[in-house]
């Protein structure tokens, strides 16, 4: 009998949410996603020590200023880890822009181009890279500009329908709505502690976004992310892509039985609405207390891990 991971691959592109080379070799995903937390964890893996040393040596050659060396080495390390992962996957690597730039469009564009330049100098073309940006209004505007310049983006930390709609209207390549973190919020802030997979608030959110995109003919890829259990993944089978942590990839691979398509749109394509204005975006996003909390929390957490990574680099310089 076929295992659930093999079955899922027939209807959804499976992406690995990790920087672990061993997991890449084992589960052979199409694409891979990283973020500051994943890079920080990957930096502890012994096989990656040479990538850290190489990034530090390179940074010393770029500048004599210690603060600039930290920035350069951190960027280079993220790209070095991405390069190692690209050797193991046929598709794309997602590399994230510093979360502390989430409300600065100009700085986000500059950082994205810096990361792309480092990949290009290593012989990697733009069609194998996705630049990850937080789904703030400023991040979405940065992505809109980058897409026009041939740099595809992955808009992350997406929790509200307003964020999803603004991303589609900006023509971004891909969004990563966070299923599990939505569930976390409802469990922590409501009376209900258990949800059937089909009623899981994160699953409901991604389903709504998927149906809206397909109904209006938006090309933006929907990639569900941040899963807490197998039920969420099975309930979103048919989503364009799903990025899954190694522990859940393992669980899927060890579970037998078919996975049935749950997401599909069979209706007619309807006209797109007028794009959200900045004021409309903020008003609609702020009507969702979960999304407001989780976006801010996600940015803070990624910024903390970015700081830890820089501290580790600083101590080695």
Swiss-Prot record:
* Gene that this sequence comes from: tal
- Catalytic residues identified in the record: 132
Protein name according to UniProt: Transaldolase
Task: Fetch the PROSITE patterns from UniProt.
Answer: TRANSALDOLASE_1 (PS01054), TRANSALDOLASE_2 (PS00958)
> What is the role of this chain?
Transaldolase is important for the balance of metabolites in the pentose-phosphate pathway.
Q: Which family does it belong to?
A: Belongs to the transaldolase family. Type 1 subfamily.
UniProt entry keywords in alphabetical sequence: Cytoplasm, Pentose shunt, Schiff base, Transferase
Q: Does the keyword Transmembrane apply?
A: no
Q: Which organism is it from?
A: Yersinia pseudotuberculosis serotype O:3 (strain YPIII)
Q: Where is this protein found?
A: Cytoplasm
Using the UniProt record, name the top-level EC class of this enzyme in a single word.
Answer: transferase
Q: Which PANTHER family match?
A: TRANSALDOLASE
* Assembly: Homodimer.
The primary location reported for this protein is: cytoplasm
Q: Which reaction equation describes what this protein catalyses?
A: D-sedoheptulose 7-phosphate + D-glyceraldehyde 3-phosphate = D-erythrose 4-phosphate + beta-D-fructose 6-phosphate
Q: What is its EC number?
A: 2.2.1.2
Q: Which GO terms describe its molecular function?
A: transaldolase activity
NCBIfam families, A to Z: PRK12346.1, talAB
Single Gene Ontology BP annotation: pentose-phosphate shunt
* Pathway participation: Carbohydrate degradation; pentose phosphate pathway; D-glyceraldehyde 3-phosphate and beta-D-fructose 6-phosphate from D-ribose 5-phosphate and D-xylulose 5-phosphate (non-oxidative stage): step 2/3
One annotated Gene Ontology cellular component of this protein: cytosol
